[in-house]
Structures are given as structure tokens and as C-alpha cells.
């Protein structure tokens, strides 16, 4: 989207805040259905970031693949779970939770120190309009298809095998009831 500077900045900050709150919802909600809906919100915000970056095809692929398929599959698997499997116990903190929070806090402080120590003056933040070559959407889609079937064939197939194994594992876990 071609927006003016302040509007674009406000949208980026707003989407970033919604993205952070949605991510916290994914982690902190005890009900897995609420967590799955928060994950859907996070994935929609990522798609809106792609729209702000003028990458409409990636935004559409994000919506179709992740929100439309993966998140619906997660909700479908959660619906097959019994209610007792995610009961609300009073045992809120375990040793694993403490270790996880310690590791995440350490990573957060490491990122903050890295960002504050980085010299940002040499980075070009925007692209100039004369450097962007306009191409048809069809040719871009064809180029993506050609790259996926030639240059990135092995990673593409490995990702599809990983997704297939995850799907089979989720189905087998749901059937063990």
C-alpha cells in the first residue's frame, strides 16, 4: 500500500502491538481453542504486514495456507480433544515453565542489547521508486512456481514431508482416545 509516512508508521505500530498481544494470547491462554484463535489473529497480522510491504501475493499465500488451512486444522484437532485433557489445574508453574521463562527472558535481553548496539545509519530503509521494476502478477507467480520446481525443489519437498508427518502425528494423537 502506498500510504503517507505517519499513517504507515501508525499502522505498523498498531499491527506490531496486536501481533505481540496475539502471541502472548497463544502462549498464555489455558484453553487451546482460545490459543488457536489467537494464533489466527497473529497470522492475519503477519499477512497485513505483507500488505503494508506491497507484497500482495505473499499476503494472500499467508492467508490461504496458514490461516485458511493450518489454523483450521489446529482448531479441528483441538475440537476432537476431550475437555479433561486441558483442564484448569491449580499447578500454574513447574520447573519447565521456570526454565522456559528464564531462556526467553535471556533471549529478549540479548535482542534488546543487540538492537541497541547496532549501527543503524548505514541501512537503507526504503527503496526508491525508480529502482523498482514493475512486472505482471502472472509473471511473478510463474517465477515463484519455476523456482519452487527447480531451484528450491528439495527444500519444498522436505517441508511438505515435515507437514505430512505433523498431520499424521496429530491425527494419530487424536485417535488414541
Curated annotation (Swiss-Prot):
Described purpose of this protein according to its UniProt entry: NDH shuttles electrons from NAD(P)H:plastoquinone, via FMN and iron-sulfur (Fe-S) centers, to quinones in the photosynthetic chain and possibly in a chloroplast respiratory chain. The immediate electron acceptor for the enzyme in this species is believed to be plastoquinone. Couples the redox reaction to proton translocation, and thus conserves the redox energy in a proton gradient.
EC number: 7.1.1.-
Catalytic activities: a plastoquinone + NADH + (n+1) H(+)(in) = a plastoquinol + NAD(+) + n H(+)(out); a plastoquinone + NADPH + (n+1) H(+)(in) = a plastoquinol + NADP(+) + n H(+)(out)
Organism: Lemna minor
Family listed: Belongs to the complex I subunit 6 family.
The keyword Protein transport is assigned to this record: no
A GO MF term: NADH dehydrogenase (ubiquinone) activity
Membrane topology: Multi-pass membrane protein
InterPro entries on file: NAD(P)H-Q_Oxidoreduct_6, NADH_UbQ/plastoQ_OxRdtase_su6, Nuo/plastoQ_OxRdtase_6_NuoJ
Pfam family, one: Oxidored_q3
Gene Ontology CC terms: chloroplast thylakoid membrane
Transmembrane region(s): 10-30, 33-53, 61-81, 92-112, 152-172
Name of the protein in question: NAD(P)H-quinone oxidoreductase subunit 6, chloroplastic
Keywords tagged on the record: Chloroplast, Membrane, NAD, NADP, Plastid, Plastoquinone, Quinone, Thylakoid, Translocase, Transmembrane, Transmembrane helix, Transport
Subcellular location: Plastid, Chloroplast thylakoid membrane
Keyword field contains Protein transport: no
Superkingdom per UniProt: Eukaryota
Description of how the protein assembles with itself and partners: NDH is composed of at least 16 different subunits, 5 of which are encoded in the nucleus.
Amino acid at each position: 500500500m502506498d500510504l503517507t509516512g505517519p499513517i504507515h508508521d501508525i499502522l505498523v505500530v498498531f499491527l506490531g502491538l496486536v501481533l505481540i498481544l496475539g502471541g502472548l494470547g497463544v502462549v498464555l491462554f489455558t484453553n487451546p481453542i482460545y490459543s488457536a484463535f489467537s494464533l489466527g489473529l497473529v497470522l492475519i497480522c503477519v499477512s497485513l504486514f505483507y500488505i503494508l510491504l506491497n507484497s500482495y501475493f505473499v499476503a494472500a499465500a499467508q492467508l490461504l495456507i496458514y490461516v485458511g488451512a493450518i489454523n483450521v486444522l489446529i482448531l479441528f484437532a483441538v475440537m476432537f480433544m476431550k475437555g479433561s485433557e486441558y483442564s484448569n489445574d491449580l499447578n500454574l508453574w513447574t520447573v519447565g515453565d521456570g526454565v522456559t521463562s528464564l531462556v526467553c527472558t535471556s533471549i529478549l535481553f540479548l535482542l534488546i542489547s543487540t538492537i541497541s548496539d547496532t549501527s543503524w545509519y548505514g541501512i537503507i530503509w526504503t527503496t526508491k521508486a525508480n529502482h523498482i521494476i514493475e512486472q505482471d502478477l502472472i509473471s511473478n507467480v510463474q517465477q515463484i512456481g519455476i523456482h519452487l520446481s527447480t531451484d528450491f525443489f528439495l527444500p519444498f519437498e522436505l517441508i511438505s514431508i515435515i507437514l505430512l508427518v505433523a498431520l499424521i502425528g496429530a491425527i494419530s494423537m487424536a485417535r488414541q482416545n
